[in-house]
Amino acid sequence: MELNIRLLLERSAKYFPGNEIVTRLPDGSLHRYTYRDLDARARRLASRLASLGIHPGDRVATFAWNTYRHFELYFALPCAGTVLHTVNLRLADEHVVYILNHSEDRAVFVDPDLLPTFERIAGELKTVKTFVVLADRVPPTTLPNVVAYEDLIRDGDPEFPFQELPERTPAGMCYTSATTGMPKGVIYTHRDIYLHTITECLGDVLDIRERDTLLPVVPMFHANAWGLPFAAACMGAKMVLPGERPHAPVILDLMQAERVTFAAAAVSIGIDMVAELKRQPRDLSSMRGLMLGGSATPAAVMEFFLKDYGFPVLTAWGSTEMTPLATCVHIGRELLQKPAIEHIPTRVRQGIPCPGTELKVLDEHGRPVPWDDQAIGEIYVRTPWSTTEYYRDERTRDGFVDGYWKSGDMSAVSPDGVLRLVDRAKDLIKSGGEWISSVDLENALVSHPQVREAAVVAAPDDKWLERPCAYVVTEPGATVGPAELRAWLEPKFAKWWLPDHYLIVDAIPKTGVGKINKRALREQVEQDLRQSA
């Protein structure tokens, strides 16, 4: 028996056909239908792909928000033998052009409000022949060869048989950002996605169940929304999809109204949720957990949700290359006997490897670091569901060693094997030959009651080569300044760790997936310091 994505959808359609999928529409209303409907519409679409000149093996791009139509594409495309290529809609035009040309996509399925991107770049796309607008009708557009999604599937076959595909058939594709150069492509097979899904649903991983109501805020264009759409279909869990441009008030209103039990979002969204809940509390009594990722979650955020709302924040670690999960927080039986607030020092860490994951932390000489929570090394990891190469990219040579992916993430390991992410290798600050963790400084700054968000980067220094510079976003009405921030940090760190500069700013730049954009901060820090002098 081959491991196929079709098995995930067929299970929910057969055994939980009436379970709901809810989508927030652009006008704020809610669209509701069921797994029975999802299955029929995905088959309708699969039966119509050939009419667009799309055949097994072709790459097909999506450029869309988290909606029911995008959810249908998650199954219709790979189950028809094509490759679901989710494209980050927040990328610069030149990166979108590069990605679509490099992957040789045959068509693009795009939400109506995102059409302007393709109106600007259509002339540069070499292989895209058709644009399918995810709507009832085609809006006014200058694009050629455009069809409306509902027109396309109207005459499709709701009982179209999905193919029995070899499990190593490519099923999905994402591009991951690169430290330098253009994004790198990662291919997922049916086997990869199936194994990752089953692992994610395990009790000691995310514990996804049919009784759950899931809200993936993490975009469906980013690492398969951390696998949650596939996990929901596998277990038949109710899905709540937040639609276009979700922000904290909308997310929290959905959590309250739909009785969400588990949600997943970037840490920056979690910080925004805290601020919104302080402004206007909600009833979140249905929640059993909130997964935050993309960067280290501040302990203060975890404490807020636990103390004020009674549910924990889950942490994990992974990447696009890992499909994406590789580790997950684990609260062992001894720790479970203690009050939940005492779990936070473990929850702020990145957990232990998921079943099936092999992970090692190596020093600069390629030797395993001791499990003393002090020695720092780079994480190397491999799983049965992770990639071993980049798509048509020579950077594979530097990115993988003996089947292990070189993550570029620096970590220490506790005596019981729990990862503590110290920093990205490129984000560590080397001052006078000694390493300083930007993550530790950021977490301490965010624990100040008047600080909403913080980022620490290296600023050039004539004597020490690099010194920490802190960018700080304060809470509304805050009066805290550099002197008080330094005093807040002094008891927590050695003197030479303390930032030399504290810049109070209105906002910190983010990447397309909500992470702090430290590359941008490093590029602007010298100018910012000159202007603040």
Model segments located where?
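Gly/Ser/Thr-rich phosphate-binding loop
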Residues: A257-A265, V274-P345, E358, H365-W371
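AMP-binding/adenylate-forming catalytic core of the ANL superfamily
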Residues: L91, V97, V108-V110, A263, ...
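Conserved adenylate-forming
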Residues: L49-I54, G156-T169, M173-L215, G227, ...
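Flexible, low-complexity linker/hinge segments
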Residues: M1-N4, E119, P139-P170
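Structural core segment of the AMP-binding/adenylate-forming
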Residues: L8-E10, S51-L52, C79-D151, P476-A478
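Conserved AMP-binding/adenylation subdomain of ANL enzymes
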Residues: Y194-T213, F221-T261, E276-L277
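Conserved ATP/PPi-binding loop(s) of AMP-dependent carboxylate-activating enzymes
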Residues: I352-G356, E364-G399, E434-I436
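Conserved AMP-binding/adenylate-forming core of the ANL superfamily
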Residues: I21-T67, F71-F75, A92-V97, A148-D151
